[in-house]
Amino acid sequence: MTVQGRILQAAFWFLLIVGLTACSGGSSPIKIKGNIATSHDVNPDHAGRPSPVVVRVYQLRAPGPFLNADFFDLYDSANATLGQNLIIWEEFEFQPGETIEYNTKFDSDTKYVGVIAAYQDLENAHWRELVTLPDKKKVHLNIKLDSLTVSVSTGKR
């Protein structure tokens, strides 16, 4: 092969690699490591007995619609309520005293994490929490469900 042929071949491979890299999509996902934990007295029923609780975790681009919506709008029609601000949501059901490791990947467009808990006593519960994700590719995220309060933190335990 001539020198000119080798240069053309090298240029071809270089352009092919650059082109494939450019087509590979957006930014890499955000790695989430943490846990979701419920207290032993979570979600008391009318007699004060702890009960299972449903939790939703929302990946969001902006906080406004999440903060302004009521529980049933978020629970029954999240896509319509949150519109383009919603990236995706996940749902879990927990027994009192249950803890799981929450290791996942969030979309790189996620700027906020919203969490709601379907407490039986919504009127007296702090059922919604929102945190801003740090601008990092690895985030430690803890979600805690107490009797009538959901809390979220992005620091170490």
Q: Which residue stretches match the model-derived regions?
A:
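A short, solvent-exposed beta-strand micro-motif common in secreted/extracellular proteins
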Residues: 110-120
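Short coil-to-beta strand junction motifs in C2/discoidin
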Residues: 47-56
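Bacterial signal peptide processing site
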Residues: 24-27
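C-terminal motif of bacterial Sec signal peptides marking the signal peptidase cleavage site
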Residues: 19-22
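Bacterial N-terminal signal peptides that target proteins for export
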Residues: 1-12
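Short amphipathic, basic-aromatic surface patches that mediate peripheral association
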Residues: 35-47
